[in-house]
Amino acid sequence: MRTTVSISDEILAAAKRRARERGQSLGAVIEDALRREFAAAHVGGARPTVPVFDGGTGPRRGIDLTSNRALSEVLDEGLELNSRK
């Protein structure tokens, strides 16, 4: 398939050199580069794992973390969050 793409003169010159070195056409070199780029993007797109903490590092009992009012009350009382467990 034919298409027109605008690329920098520097990249085009490098691609032509690579094509000569490998004995390939310019189109084959560009296609290989795009395939590698797309493959790398797919591999790197894996979702990161989220650590799960057990044993004392989570929210304290008696404090509703979804309520701004509850958090403000705890902070306004001057009590440390650890004292509410």
UniProtKB/Swiss-Prot annotation:
InterPro entries tied to this protein: CopG
GO biological process, one term: regulation of DNA-templated transcription
The keyword Nucleotide-binding is assigned to this record: no
Keyword Ribonucleoprotein found: no
Alphabetized Pfam families for the sequence: RHH_1
Keywords carried by this UniProt record: Toxin-antitoxin system
Superkingdom of this protein's organism: Bacteria
Inducers of expression: Induced in persister cells in response to D-cycloserine.
Function: Antitoxin component of a type II toxin-antitoxin (TA) system. Upon expression in M.smegmatis neutralizes the effect of cognate toxin VapC31.
Listed name of the protein: Antitoxin VapB31
